[in-house]
From Swiss-Prot:
Protein's name according to its UniProt entry: Cap-specific mRNA (nucleoside-2'-O-)-methyltransferase 2
Species whose genome carries this gene: Mus musculus
Active site feature: 117, 235, 275
Localization annotation: Nucleus; Cytoplasm
Gene Ontology MF terms in the entry: mRNA (nucleoside-2'-O-)-methyltransferase activity
Main location group: nucleus
One annotated Gene Ontology cellular component of this protein: cytoplasm
Catalytic EC class: transferase
Keyword Aminoacyl-tRNA synthetase: no
Chain positions recorded as S-adenosyl-L-methionine binding sites: 148, 167, 235
GO biological process: 7-methylguanosine mRNA capping; methylation
This protein's record includes keyword S-adenosyl-L-methionine: yes
């Protein structure tokens, strides 16, 4: 049988092969730029500081008319099936082939839409000040930067053009590892971040939220050794799908905080790139006037690789006049930092010159026309697209690729010039997370419909049945075996990190985000019923649908694993093996054959701890767990085994303690569920083959315990968030183990809560 010959990759056509009308359309795609030409009489000046925040917002009629006309066209999309609409606009996007081509053609690191957009900005404007080239040093700050595409794009630009300067950068983003941050507001892709964490600043509370004054103050300290800052970028936004017509107003406070941060940190002559949306609102007019008074040049630019139908634009500000020029106003702006700034207008109407308003209206009209044309054209093609139009679109997309490459003269970059040459670590968000996040609710419409349903409706419609079904056939722990070595405990780099006390655990790098979100909803909406699930579901029913590992079966598994563990001479252990069993006195009556010698470490509180929205983030639980662990470690000798109950392992703190166990035992696995009671501790860690814990590590954990004791008071505003470097928790097999452990625990809780809800519903119907 002959092998099928692989066809050569299709080579993009030269620009000369495209028709004049196609070339004209594509060149227009790359010409969406507007410049604020300033009057020669220097009329555009900042008003007296006393004028700022002196009155409420009052919209401009002409701009409001533009906003309303745009929203009228957007409203025509409300009856479209959004997943179909997204597929359609992906095809009609004239720049749709550029990203994949660039990735292959120039070997771009983290090549995303943002990478290409920033490359366009870099190649279209002199963002890097001459002072950076003269000094041989470039310093940049990147706000709301995750996953890091602007940084990767800038690296490619500098390295491929061989610019003669040493580059240092600092980045910010909502911290994807902070348990109180909401997944909906974050970019959870950490491919670059996990490998460059020393360059990311998440603030004194470790959340990464730039909309607090504490963050701004902390950032200034963090940047103190990196002066001057030549370039600041701010690419912030958040999900406005629930109210797309008000996107501009919803993100205005974020844009304000980004702009203030830039004006405070940027050096004289520096550049600032700010992502905004439509510029119709009073708050946007004020911000644009502020930027025009603070920089020599301001341009509004829509990259070709920014989807033409959306409102996104980039405000490119060149040659900063310096803090001295804006200092009096800046001081007042800092006092209004955060979400509160939306209450009062930065400037009243009368201080903004008519010449600026006219120019600004021109700008808004310019981009309004392009966006309106694109949406209208997409609607027309959605209703009917013939073969000829499809061919023309394909021609336009091919032409756009060539136009992009020719206009910006991108050059290849070898991998050894990438920021992350070889990724050794990566959060589960990038391995299991991305494979699972859309597994259960595939279409946008389904996800939006889920938001409108009550918890009871979701249960009744069987939305979570797949998890329950997986749980009943799943045998957790059997294939999750962690093999450890003491050499992994490189405690010299360990450091306690404190932060704002967690109100609840909303996200975790060690668990499927959709499962955690659903479990939280179940606890929140169904807590009263959930606590009495055992009264509604008989033990026989629970055992049939959800097998429980008894103490005997857990110890039998422990014995089996112990026999697999060779002693120092390579044979099975011949003498008795001490088994430290942490838990309730009820297990004292268990009769186990040799070689296990059971010793009880009594801790009723640990086994009876109830699950809440804090999960294992509750400082009281963490203190109790660490106390039991330290007490147990004092009694262990080489070769001993231990059974340790665990509530869950969603937090960095508990993941750190699991990492320690991983380092001082030959093997670790788990059993779940081990309890019939809902929302109680239902899993145990089986730790086999103790290998001695270094005294320095034990002392470190003792110090953590002592600090925990001091922070245990309910009124304490802070808690310990982590004590191991995040890099240590993001590598090896630990991530997979924690993912499996947390999935088993969460699905068990969900299963019993859902079972209780169903039985209650059936009982109500019978009545």
């Amino acid at each position: 049988m002959s092998k099928r010959r692989k066809l050569p990759a299709r080579q993009p056509a030269c620009l000369e092969t495209f028709s004049p009308d196609v070339l004209n359309d594509v060149s227009e795609l790359f010409a969406k730029s507007f410049s604020y030409r300033k009057p020669l009489d220097n009329e555009w000046q900042l008003p007296a500081p006393t004028e700022s925040f002196s009155c409420g917002h009052l919209e401009f009629r002409a701009l409001l008319d533009l906003k309303n006309s745009l929203n009228e066209v957007k409203n025509l999309l409300s009856d479209k099936k959004l997943d179909e609409w997204h597929r359609h606009t992906a095809f009609t996007n004239k720049a749709g082939k550029i990203i994949s081509h660039v990735k292959k053609a120039v070997n771009a690191e983290l090549c995303t839409q943002a990478w290409c957009k920033f490359q366009e900005i870099l190649c279209s404007f002199p963002l890097i000040p001459q002072e950076a080239f003269q000094s041989g040093r470039l310093n940049s700050l990147h706000l709301c930067e995750a996953p890091g595409a602007f940084i990767a794009s800038l690296n490619h630009y500098l390295k491929s053009h061989r610019f003669p300067c040493e580059w240092s950068w600092v980045a910010n983003s909502l911290n994807p590892y902070h348990e109180a941050n909401d997944n909906l507001r974050m970019i959870t892709d950490d491919r670059l971040m996990a490998n460059t964490l020393h360059c990311w600043y998440f603030g004194p509370d470790n959340t990464g939220d730039i909309m607090t004054l504490k963050y701004l103050t902390g950032l200034q300290d963090f940047l103190s050794g990196m002066s001057p800052i030549h370039l600041v970028t701010a690419d912030g936004s958040f999900d406005c799908q629930g109210n797309p017509g008000e996107q501009e107003a919803l993100v205005s406070s974020l844009h304000y905080c980004e702009a203030v941060t830039a004006l405070i940190t940027l050096g004289d002559g520096g550049s600032f790139v700010l992502k905004m949306f439509t510029l119709f609102e009073h708050c946007s007019v004020n911000l644009m006037y502020l930027l025009n008074c603070s920089f020599d040049q301001v341009h509004v630019f829509k990259p070709a690789t920014s989807k033409a139908g959306n409102s996104e634009v980039y405000v490119v500000c060149l040659r900063y006049k310096g803090r001295e020029a804006v200092q009096p106003l800046l001081s007042r702006m800092v006092l209004n930092f955060g979400t509160e700034m939306t209450r009062k207008a930065l400037f009243p109407h009368h201080v903004i010159p008519k010449s600026f308003l006219e120019r600004h209206e021109e700008c808004c009209t310019f981009f309004h026309r392009y966006q309106l044309e694109t949406i209208s054209e997409n609607i027309r093609l959605f209703e009917s697209m013939g073969t000829g139009e499809q061919e023309r679109l394909n021609n336009l997309r091919d032409c756009a690729v060539q136009y992009f490459m020719q206009k910006f003269q991108l050059k290849p970059l070898s991998r050894n010039h990438w920021l992350v040459k070889k990724s050794n670590i990566g959060c589960s968000m990038n391995t299991k997370w991305f494979g699972q996040r859309n597994k259960y609710f595939k279409t946008y419409n389904e996800r939006k419909m889920m938001e409108t349903l009550s918890w009871k409706d979701k249960v009744a419609k069987g939305y979570f049945n797949s998890w329950a079904e997986e749980h009943t056939v799943y045998h957790p722990g059997q294939n999750s075996l962690l093999e450890g070595t003491a050499s992994s405990l490189e405690y010299q780099s360990w450091q306690v990190l404190e932060g704002k006390k967690l109100p609840k655990v909303k996200c975790s790098p060690f668990c499927d985000g959709e499962i955690l979100k659903t479990l939280n909803e179940a606890i929140e909406k169904s807590l009263g019923e959930a606590l009495s699930v055992d009264a509604k579901v008989s033990s026989k029913q629970q055992y049939r649908c959800c097998p429980v590992f008894s103490e005997e079966s857990v110890l039998s598994e422990l014995l089996r694993l112990t026999k697999c563990l060779p002693d120092e001479q390579g044979a099975e252990p011949s003498g008795p093996v001490k088994c430290l069993l942490v838990g309730s006195p009820a297990v004292c009556d268990l009769q186990m054959p040799a070689p296990l010698e059971i010793q009880l470490v009594e801790s009723v509180e640990l086994t009876a701890f109830s699950c809440s929205l804090l999960h294992d983030g509750d400082p009281a639980y963490q203190h109790l767990f660490l106390d039991c662990l330290l007490h147990s470690l004092r009694r262990l000798h080489r070769g001993d085994v231990m059974v340790l109950p665990i509530l869950s392992c969603f937090t960095r703190f508990m993941a750190g303690l699991t990492f320690v166990l991983h380092g001082c035992f030959r093997f670790i696995t788990f059993s779940c569920p081990t309890s019939l009671e809902p929302l109680r501790t239902c899993a145990v860690l089986l730790c086999i083959g103790y290998q001695n814990l270094p005294d320095a590590v034990f002392q470190f954990l003792q110090n953590v315990h002592d600090l925990l004791s001091k922070l245990l008071h309910p009124s304490a505003p802070r808690q310990i968030l982590q004590f191991l470097p995040m890099e240590a928790l993001l590598q090896g097999t630990l991530l997979d183990f924690l993912w499996d452990l947390n999935a088993a625990i969460a699905k068990r809780h969900l299963h019993l809560i859902i079972q209780g809800e169903r039985d209650q519903a059936i009982g109500s119907l019978e009545l």
